[in-house]
């Protein structure tokens, strides 16, 4: 619990006490929403015209036809006024991490207990490719879960990496389980490197895989103890 002030019931007037309570309530509400959401609420309620994408201009374009008005009534003006692009200066920028966007990224990093957090609007697939393009160079050996998402396969192709696959288990129901611990042994990985036709003539003992990618969790909900 935190103490922010006192109310002197027998000294202050009811009007003053009411203003005091309203001030504290407003302070609570102002700090309740995370940074970007608060900026989005403020922008949508500001009454500014929309001269940027999307082309419905804050929902106005939908009001020009009967079916458009049905659409507008179904979703509501509030949502359509808040449907904006990254050209709105008041909301900050995803590309250079400024303004409320940057504040929200810092807030998310704090919540996740991470050093940094960057928002991506193209989903996990694009996030995976970004990590790989930053980390992996053509010809690098990478160790990858054979039950990986297709974005990892795309990353292998795009970066020119040489994959060494770890084979997961599968039960009699066809459900793919975790990768056996034996697959992670150095000797097992070196054996896979020696057997890889794309690495013919390479000294397996000298190879240092550039990245390890696991599917966490699997599509059937299997979780690894990554510690």
Q: What spans do the regions from the language model cover?
A:
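Conserved beta-loop-alpha segment that forms the PLP phosphate-binding cup at the N-terminus of a helix
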Residues: 116-144, 150-155
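Conserved N-terminal alpha-helix of the aminotransferase class I/II PLP-enzyme fold
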Residues: 68, 73-126
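Active-site phosphate-binding strand-loop segment of PLP-dependent enzymes
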Residues: 174-227
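Conserved acidic residues
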Residues: 4-7, 115, 140, 210
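Gly/Ser/Thr-rich loops at beta-strand to alpha-helix junctions
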Residues: 98-101, 122-127, 148-151, 217-222
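N-terminal glycine-rich, Lys/His-bearing helix-loop that initiates the first secondary-structure elements
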Residues: 1-81
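Substrate-binding/gating loop at the entrance of the active-site cleft, primarily
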Residues: 144-163, 168-170
């Amino acid at each position: 619990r935190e103490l922010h002030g006192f109310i002197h019931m027998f000294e202050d007037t009811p009007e003053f006490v009411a203003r005091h309570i309203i001030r504290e309530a407003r302070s609570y509400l102002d700090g309740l929403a995370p940074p970007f959401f608060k900026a989005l609420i403020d922008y949508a309620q500001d009454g500014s015209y929309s001269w940027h994408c999307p082309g419905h201009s804050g929902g106005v374009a939908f009001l020009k036809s009967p079916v458009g008005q049905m659409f507008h009534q179904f979703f509501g003006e509030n949502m359509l006024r808040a449907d904006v692009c990254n050209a709105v200066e008041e909301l900050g920028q995803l590309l250079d991490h400024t303004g409320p966007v940057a504040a929200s990224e810092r807030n998310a990093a704090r919540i996740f207990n991470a050093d940094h957090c960057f928002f991506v609007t193209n989903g996990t697939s694009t996030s995976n490719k970004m990590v790989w393009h930053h980390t992996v160079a053509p010809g690098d050996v990478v160790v990858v879960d054979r039950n990986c998402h297709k974005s990892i396969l795309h990353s292998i192709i795009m970066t020119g990496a040489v994959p060494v696959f770890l084979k997961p288990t599968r039960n009699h129901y066809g459900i793919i389980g975790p990768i056996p611990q034996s697959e992670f042994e150095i000797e097992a990985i070196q054996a896979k490197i020696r057997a890889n036709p794309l690495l013919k003539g390479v000294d397996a003992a000298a190879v240092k895989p550039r990245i390890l990618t696991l599917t966490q969790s699997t599509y059937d909900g299997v979780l690894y103890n990554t510690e």
